[in-house]
Amino acid sequence: MDLVSSLPDDVRCHILSFLTTKESALTSVLSKKWRNLFTLVPNLDLDDSEYLHPEETKWEREEILDSFLDFVERVLSLQGNGPIRRFSLRCESGVPPARLNRWLCKVLQRGVADLELIIDFEDGYLLPRELFVSETLVNLRLKSEFGCIHWWPGAEGTFLPRLQSLDISSAMVFCDDKLQKLLPCFPVIEELRLVGMEWIDSHVTVSCATLTNQLLLSSTGSRTSKNPKSVSFDTPNLLSLAYSDLVAEDYPLVNMKSLFKARIILGVDDDQIARMRAPTNYLSEDDVVRRFGNVVKLMKGIQNVQQLHLHSDTLEVLSMCCESMPVFNNVKTLGIKSDYDRGWQAVPALLRNCPHLETLTFEGLVHHVTDKCGDACDCIFRKDKGRSLKSCPVKVVEIKEFRVTMKEMHLIEHFLDNFPCLKEMKIYREEYDPSPFGNDPQVDDLILDMIEEYKDIYSCNVQLLEPCDKWDEQ
């Protein structure tokens, strides 16, 4: 007898808990001692992708999916009513609603604490009521890449007393109640991630003192207006914020005094950007973009952060409040995502107002050139060239998505000339370079020669590196 087989059942079950349910089920053929031992494991990890292969025909795939669903049914039946800690089901081809609800009710009755569903839900599918009143759920994750997730229409009866983490991600998330009414239903929640959320009205409030680890909100807008009328945050103990939404007309309350990290995407369309760039006297008194300057209230509310990451659309919105930009005394890391059609008007104000900045990261060195571009770039000649850079104490500059163009090289030289405390510059090449010189070895050699010259001319350590991870909205 092998040493593992001689171990007690509870020890072998613990070993099996590190495997997927399919892998642990395969151990049943080892010997009688292993037969159906996997049914005692309190964690179920069921994934249809382990059964499917791209080369299979449609008929074969349907047959295999039916076999997978039958396997899930058998496993739950063999386990009986024993306690279960985790139930993870990934079936992106979908599950018949009646069957899925039967499984969910079964694991909820057995006291599941960690529930994960990655399924393309059918149109109109509603999760069972039992899920919204579970007394054992600690972590709940719902993901549907192409389908829509409907939070239970009777959500006023929701109460999940132990839920600490709620993660909902979908093409569209519908909730028939206001978020501020729903959050009290989770009295100990620490992490909230809602991706694809549609606000029920145009006034949004996120108020929760227990949120600490993370708040990720990615909204598709409001049912009643294009841009939210107001968005408020009262989360005094929150450490990490990732917020993506259409820019609101007002941010009347932003209480995030404990915030350590913020990633902000404030969406605007091309027409709104054109109006923001126009002279103020060209705008009517009731033009919504006049009120976009209220974004300064959001920035003041998060000004204690140490890590701040801003999307290219956000930079355009911030151009409406450059004069009133708050000072970010604690910011050590500033990240900027660039785009050809979005301007850098706000970048000089940001650099001036981060007096203790240590690391500056650009994802892309491209931007739309305007007469308000400021002195952070060298696109337009100015007598005070590089003034905002010369007052910036940044020590490390990271440049991602480098596309091997001379325009980028000129901007890199501009940084090297004007950042007085710069010690290190890391340049990461674009993985799929769209530029005409992306695969030209002569251009590569020229760029490498220029970078070697920089090392001789400047005290800064300049490195050309392989591609790295790109902007992460979460």
From Swiss-Prot:
The LRR repeat ranges on this chain: 140-170, 171-196, 220-245, 281-312, 339-364
Keyword Repeat in record: yes
InterPro entries to which the protein is assigned, alphabetical: F-box-like_dom_sf (IPR036047), F-box_AtFBL13-like (IPR053781), F-box_dom (IPR001810), FBD (IPR006566), FBL60-like (IPR055294), LRR_dom_sf (IPR032675), LRR_FXL15/At3g58940/PEG3-like (IPR055411)
Assigned keywords, A-Z: Leucine-rich repeat, Repeat
Domain F-box: 1-62
Repeat in keyword set: yes
Pfam family, any one: F-box
Xref: PANTHER family: BNAANNG15180D PROTEIN, RNI-LIKE SUPERFAMILY PROTEIN
Protein name per Swiss-Prot or TrEMBL: F-box/LRR-repeat protein At3g03030
Species the sequence originates in: Arabidopsis thaliana (Mouse-ear cress)
